[in-house]
C-alpha cells in the first residue's frame, strides 16, 4: 500500500500534480503540498507536516536502484513517479539525489568487500586485490 492515495497526485482534469506537491515550487496554494525539497521533513506555514522527498528517495532507492519499490511505496504507481522525476522543475534535484544514491551504493559495496577481506574468508584475497587495484586501500 502506498504512503498516499492516487487522488492526492491527480488534479481535477486527470493530470498529475507536480509543482503543487512541493513547498518550494507551489507559489500560490499550499493545499496540495505533501513534500519539501529540503533534506529533512518540515512543517509548512499552516502547520501541515511535509515529507522530505530527498530523504524518502535516498532511504528507498539505496536498497533498490531501479526506483520501482520507491515509486510503489510512495506514489502507488510508477507513472506518477516517472512524471515527477522527469519534470524540468525537478530534474536538477533528481540528478543530485540519483548521484548520491550511486555513491551510497558504491560505499556499501566497498565496505562489504573490505569486511570480507578482514574476515579472511574464502574470497579475502580477491577482495583485498580488488580494493588495492581500485585504490580504495
Model-derived regions: residue spans:
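N-terminal, charge-rich alpha-helical recognition modules
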Residues: 1-111
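Amphipathic alpha-helical protein-protein interaction segments
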Residues: 106-137
Amino acid at each position: 500500500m502506498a504512503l498516499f492515495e492516487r487522488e492526492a497526485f491527480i488534479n481535477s482534469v486527470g493530470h498529475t500534480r507536480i509543482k503543487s506537491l512541493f513547498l518550494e515550487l507551489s507559489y500560490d496554494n499550499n493545499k496540495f503540498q505533501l513534500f519539501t525539497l529540503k533534506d529533512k521533513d518540515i512543517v509548512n506555514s499552516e502547520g501541515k507536516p511535509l515529507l522530505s522527498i530527498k530523504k524518502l528517495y535516498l532511504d528507498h532507492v539505496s536498497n533498490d536502484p531501479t526506483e520501482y519499490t520507491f515509486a510503489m511505496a510512495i506514489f502507488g504507481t510508477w507513472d506518477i513517479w516517472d512524471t515527477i522525476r522527469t519534470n524540468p522543475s525537478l530534474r536538477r534535484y533528481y540528478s543530485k539525489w540519483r548521484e548520491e544514491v550511486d555513491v551510497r551504493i558504491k560505499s556499501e559495496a566497498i565496505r562489504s568487500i573490505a569486511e570480507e577481506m578482514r574476515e579472511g574468508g574464502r574470497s579475502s584475497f580477491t577482495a583485498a586485490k580488488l580494493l588495492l587495484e581500485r585504490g580504495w586501500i
